């Protein structure tokens, strides 16, 4: 049975090549029944079977089953783009997920996959199979290969693929040199936004966004797939943290904080030319010229007819709900927005997911915002153009307007947070616990974080359809930091040991013009670095915590992991949560870039009472190392407090951060120093 489970992963290998061709390290071939072959191959099915089966490393017989009705998923042409933001595509994907989830065992799933893989749009097939593997009880131990392995065309310069085809055809597998991806290939230095392209176009960051939306889909026939613990709040918090991080990166590069996209009638000043090609659609991703305005959509092919005024109506209804602190339900009654669950209700309304309390009334503001922007170059399909990068969760974060749109959405959520009662001492204090200091120790100067460029390699071999087999490595440049430790001095004046929840954040200290931030501005720029629980015994305690253990990030190896390197066998605890573990902020982007002279920031630590924060649950074998932005699979979010606590609410009594401090908190001024040099991955220093 575990063999059949592993066979499912072969469908991710060279996704546009038919599954009767050799797949994976073992050159496995699916032996499919004659009636499964598409019409174009049916007359030669025997010859095909003999041709690819003769030197196969392993033959996989496929059970001939009565196939479900696939008419709906097959409405999306094989060689089109696929977007979860487009309601029609969402409906087709929801039906296919339903079919995959409904197969009675793994053998039947393998059978229907072999039929679908030859006919269904590869992007949609990959997405639906990934969601099914993540959520079926009998496939939970499987590690889905990273999306950049299957579809590298969504993440890098198309020139790389021409070189890769040349290398794989000419050079034998073991002797291939990595192909270098240029770092700045989408714009010149004349474009100020290009200064933060290293963040927007980072492969790991875009993979994080894609994987988060894979783990938290907003549509499926089975509500349990969508209705996960606090998913609406997590939607708010994960994107809020992205905006905080992006704003800090901008200030490190002498740019102002991102301006909200809040006037839907105004032109979008920023243009974006993605320089990406879609291998499935055989088209270049369309650009958006500077000064483009979103216009009413009328695209019958996508079943979209929507006016810009609809966005404005949905927004106004949303603001009205916050003003009234209650949401209108379909039956006309009001659901109060309380301080415990209000943000979760609003998050699901905003996104909007199928668990939105009233989708017909509050609409689909977040998703349709993406759709309007992504079709701004061809709103009525007269030029037969497909959507731009804002229409795909794997590419949206490359575009500067993504951050402008989400800065506005974040602002709307903050309006709700402003209506909540500020935290009092009862919520902030931890009696008998005093944090006397926090500091950073690393390889060099104390309280200094060091950043630089690093070159790493990713294997494109699995995504190179119709080319000779073997690894094809691409080398790309990304930001990296030297690892460091937090050193926290805590004094427990009580008579017994207690468990504390340590919350570590970092924020800039001065704004674009060099003026110190007010507390209200600074709290919105607080970046969560780590959160962990630890015992505090009576007297003085020195607690050291390694940066590599952050609850926010996943290690480099998991962002770019090779599916063949999965720990342990499927079904064991070591592998059981590996797929969920693919969700997390990339560790190489934990620390902002800083500046060559040293960018001033403030490190903040708070110790709260674990007894107030804890969620009673068994976490054995659970992947909880990146729980801050991703939660834990099949479990509750592992912290009862609001996400972003203690900075999620305003504190009118505090004008500066030092006014806000309690005895169980401490701060330390530190600097982030960037050195403009590049090291190879694996080198130290």
From Swiss-Prot:
Its cofactor is Cu(2+). It comes from the Eukaryota. Glycans are attached at residues 184, 254, 324, 491, 540. Coiled coil: none annotated. Disulfide bonds join 581-623, 583-630. The keyword Cell membrane does not apply. Keywords: Copper, Disulfide bond, Glycoprotein, Melanin biosynthesis, Metal-binding, Monooxygenase, Oxidoreductase, Secreted, Zymogen. The keyword Aminoacyl-tRNA synthetase does not apply. Cu cation A binds at residues 209, 213, 239. One of its GO terms (biological process) is melanin biosynthetic process from tyrosine. GO terms for molecular function: metal ion binding; tyrosinase activity. It catalyses: 2 L-dopa + O2 = 2 L-dopaquinone + 2 H2O; L-tyrosine + O2 = L-dopaquinone + H2O. Synthesized by hemocytes and released into the hemolymph plasma. The N-terminus is blocked. Its EC number is 1.14.18.1. InterPro entries: Di-copper_centre_dom_sf, Hemocyanin/hexamerin, Hemocyanin/hexamerin_mid_dom, Hemocyanin_C, Hemocyanin_C_sf, Hemocyanin_N, Hemocyanin_N_sf, Ig_E-set. Cu cation B binds at residues 366, 370, 406. Belongs to the tyrosinase family. This is a copper-containing oxidase that functions in the formation of pigments such as melanins and other polyphenolic compounds. Catalyzes the rate-limiting conversions of tyrosine to DOPA, DOPA to DOPA-quinone and possibly 5,6 dihydroxyindole to indole-5'6 quinone. Heterodimer. This is Phenoloxidase subunit 1. It comes from Bombyx mori (Silk moth). The lineage of its organism: Eukaryota, Metazoa, Ecdysozoa, Arthropoda, Hexapoda.
